[in-house]
Amino acid sequence: IIRGDSGIDIETVSVSIQNSLCFGLLDGTRQIGFARLVTDFATFGYLCDVYVLNDYQKSGLGRWLIECCHAHPLMSRLRRIMLVTDSAPWLYQKMGYLPLNRPDFVWQINRPDMYRKTEGK
């Protein structure tokens, strides 16, 4: 599933998937959800790209998808699992995630328009 508004090209999506532990959510043979874990496979994981198609939202499938991610044997050995999101904070809190509201603790370089094509190119 590639969100059309992301601006990310298919090659970048492919490389990101190849270098992640991925989880798919299917309705028959149709993919309706996705999540991936970027990890060192020992101590740290970054849960990202958690997505359920609009027609399937509000049915508990997003929570179930995250539960499936958490049930993977690798997850039990990770000391820290992080995610960055601006949607459904109530869901992630129910799943054991806590907001990091400590100053000078988490830092980032954020380039939100990295994959957007500029006009004229």
Where are these regions (language model features)?
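Active-site-proximal cofactor/substrate-binding loop regions of enzyme domains
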Residues: V38, I66-C69
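Conserved acetyl-CoA pyrophosphate-binding loop and the N-cap/start of the following alpha-helix
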Residues: Y56, G60-L65
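A conserved beta-strand-loop-helix scaffold within acyl/acetyltransferase catalytic domains
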Residues: E11-Y51
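Hydrophobic pocket-lining residues that define ligand/cofactor binding sites across diverse proteins
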Residues: P73
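Conserved active-site alpha-helix within GNAT-family acetyltransferase domains
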Residues: R63, R77-R111
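Short amphipathic alpha-helix that is part of the acyltransferase structural core
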Residues: I1-I8, T118-K121
